[in-house]
Amino acid sequence: MEQEQDTPWTQSTEHINIQKKGSGQQTQKLGRPNSTRLMDHYLRIMSQVDMHKQTVSWRLWLSLRNPTQGSLRTRALKQWKSFNKQGWTN
C-alpha cells in the first residue's frame, strides 16, 4: 500500500477527533481525511442538494398542475392585493 506523504494539503486538512472516555476525560486523536472519503462526502452532499431541488420543483409543478383550494385562495389574494395597490387609476 502507498502511504500519503506530508504535503501542505494533507497538513492543512489534519483534523482532531475528540472522543470521551467513560470517566469524562477527553482524548485527542489526530488523523487525516482520506481523499476518497472526502470525495465520497462531497458527492453525498451534492446528491442530497440535487434531491432537495428536485423535490421542491416537483412540488411546485404539482401545485400548479393540480391547485388545491388553499393555493387558489392564496393566488387570488395576491392578485387582489396587487390590483388594489395599482388603484382605480386605469
UniProtKB/Swiss-Prot annotation:
<keyword id="KW-0899">Viral immunoevasion</keyword>
<keyword id="KW-0053">Apoptosis</keyword>
<dbReference type="GO" id="GO:0016020">
    <property type="term" value="C:membrane"/>
</dbReference>
<keyword id="KW-1035">Host cytoplasm</keyword>
<feature type="region of interest" description="Disordered">
    <location>
        <begin position="1"/>
        <end position="34"/>
    </location>
</feature>
<keyword id="KW-1113">Inhibition of host RLR pathway by virus</keyword>
<dbReference type="GO" id="GO:0039545">
    <property type="term" value="P:symbiont-mediated suppression of host cytoplasmic pattern recognition receptor signaling pathway via inhibition of MAVS activity"/>
</dbReference>
<keyword id="KW-1043">Host membrane</keyword>
<keyword id="KW-1048">Host nucleus</keyword>
<keyword id="KW-0472">Membrane</keyword>
<comment type="function">
    <text>Plays an important role in promoting lung pathology in both primary viral infection and secondary bacterial infection. Promotes alteration of mitochondrial morphology, dissipation of mitochondrial membrane potential, and cell death. Alternatively, inhibits the production of interferon in the infected cell at the level of host mitochondrial antiviral signaling MAVS. Its level of expression differs greatly depending on which cell type is infected, in a manner that is independent of the levels of expression of other viral proteins. Monocytic cells are more affected than epithelial cells.</text>
</comment>
<feature type="region of interest" description="Mitochondrial targeting sequence">
    <location>
        <begin position="65"/>
        <end position="87"/>
    </location>
</feature>
<keyword id="KW-0945">Host-virus interaction</keyword>
<keyword id="KW-1090">Inhibition of host innate immune response by virus</keyword>
<protein>
    <recommendedName>
        <fullName>Protein PB1-F2</fullName>
    </recommendedName>
</protein>
<dbReference type="GO" id="GO:0042025">
    <property type="term" value="C:host cell nucleus"/>
</dbReference>
<dbReference type="GO" id="GO:0044192">
    <property type="term" value="C:host cell mitochondrial inner membrane"/>
</dbReference>
<keyword id="KW-1045">Host mitochondrion</keyword>
<dbReference type="GO" id="GO:0052150">
    <property type="term" value="P:symbiont-mediated perturbation of host apoptosis"/>
</dbReference>
<comment type="similarity">
    <text>Belongs to the influenza viruses PB1-F2 family.</text>
</comment>
<keyword id="KW-1046">Host mitochondrion inner membrane</keyword>
<keyword id="KW-1119">Modulation of host cell apoptosis by virus</keyword>
<dbReference type="InterPro" id="IPR021045">
    <property type="entry name" value="Flu_proapoptotic_PB1-F2"/>
</dbReference>
<comment type="subunit">
    <text>Oligomer. Interacts with human SLC25A6/ANT3 and VDAC1. Interacts with host MAVS.</text>
</comment>
<feature type="site" description="Low pathogenicity">
    <location>
        <position position="66"/>
    </location>
</feature>
<keyword id="KW-1097">Inhibition of host MAVS by virus</keyword>
<dbReference type="Pfam" id="PF11986">
    <property type="entry name" value="PB1-F2"/>
</dbReference>
<dbReference type="GO" id="GO:0044164">
    <property type="term" value="C:host cell cytosol"/>
</dbReference>
